[in-house]
């Protein structure tokens, strides 16, 4: 892209010199997008033109507890004000991890909230995953919960989790079935055999330093990647650990989100931008290339290859197939985008779901909808 190359520690770092981008998409689709996002200010949804011709009735809401620590002016029609994690299980149910309202399950007919009365004592959920037996695992700031469809079981210090504050995207079930848990004080692995015998079933993964883990993922080759807020990125191939940090030409030691594109490249978010790693070369994109905001933390790559990046103050849509500077489209508060995006998820049908500080949004590839308890859940 007309950049310049620097060599550090045997690794090539590419930095772009493209001038800042001020361009915004001026299509009808963008106008629709920005108008809908303005509904974060408390307006009703449905400023996208026509709503679905035959919307399905809203689901039955099942909630047997009073939400904790919610603002007096909290909009009770929202699925929840803060949605920190989103996941779709093997049965197609969508799960939403919230702050102060536990976890909610949507199965097309009901929206069910689970909290203290159900044995799910903690109300803030930062990570969700499913194991090979169909159990759901939830990461909270009070340890891990396993849900077998009937009963919640909590794991904490007594089970070997010396640190019980689970990271965002801090639960991974790898291809072999091993369950990894990232905390703010290291990474742990779960031993189901020890659990069945009533012993300590979580043990510290000692091949890693005691990192402040910001996320765990498995790539297409079966390597496990760990993002940290203080030591860069680590890759584990089943035998050895490789650390990619400042000394290896990563521009900083902070890494937040991780994703892998269709070509096998790894992408990392950092405080000052995002970085693509092809196994040899690190290519960095910053505000000079068109990224908006500061302190980049979330990243997801759609099945189509479109990359979404969340940051403090903005969200950026990045199309790698388009030459810079036109590859980036930034949405900020100036565009009416006042919602702080806290989670992004693409379901099996390809629809994109956005958890924000002002509720839930759905993006079907063409339009954005704010999804409240009564919908619209489907387009």
Walk through the language-model features, giving the residues of each:
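Carboxylate-rich, polar loop motifs that coordinate divalent cations or form catalytic acidic clusters
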Residues: 1-379
